[in-house]
Amino acid sequence: MPNISDSFRTLAIALLFLIGLFGWLLPMTLLLAPFGKHTEALRHRLMWRACRFAARHLPGTKLEMKGEKEAEWQRPSVLVSNHQSSLDLLCLLMLSPRLVVVTNQRQWRNALYGAVIRRLNFLPIGMGFDAMQQQVGRLAKEGYSVVIFPEGTRSRNGRLGRFHQGAFALAAHLKLPLVPVVLHGTDRIFPKGSHTFRRGKIEVEIHPAWPAPDNNEAAIRETRHKMRALFMERLGQGGNGKVCYSDTNLRGYSPPEYISDTHSSSHA
């Protein structure tokens, strides 16, 4: 049962969202869209500034960044992140004005939100791997990085779901580095299925880039398992503690059975 402060906080955030979307972001994006490539960078910068402002000024929340100064956003890459809340996208889009996101079909078809993201080069997950590879490759040549949630959907209980292969296969095919971004706390502030925002702290943890895996099934699978091991360890879901993060290569990497998908709570 939400308390009064949570209800007022939710109302304040909803008003800020509506004012930002209808009063600024949507009109500016639609007005600039007819000018095509000439205003593409400006549209992305508008989204970046809006998300950066919103993430830093959410009522009742504290934002902490780790690894932001060391991040190399000028280098196109595949960002992979855990998915716990609708707030996750806000926390990722604030990182750089040169990000595009692989999003689900429901968001892509939304009359209002979809109108914005289609003009920001976001990609629908249903387009298929070959088309996705072609589009991501084109965007990478233009200096953009792509954000993918390898779980495919938000977790209902905060537990890390199984990682699907797509992000790692894309990185392998296009020879793009992988950047792990671990999100903490968004599930406690606005969990899946909730209609109210709670007080809390959000941590955005940006890790050094991993090299692209070799373009073969075994290497892609191994990178997927290693990446999930990193996220499990950083989220404190490492079970018996055999996986200890030390560097991008996960020294002391545990056997696959340790990071099996038995804790998965959601599937794409």
State where each predicted segment sits.
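Non-catalytic C-terminal accessory region of glycerolipid acyltransferases
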Residues: 4-8, 130-268
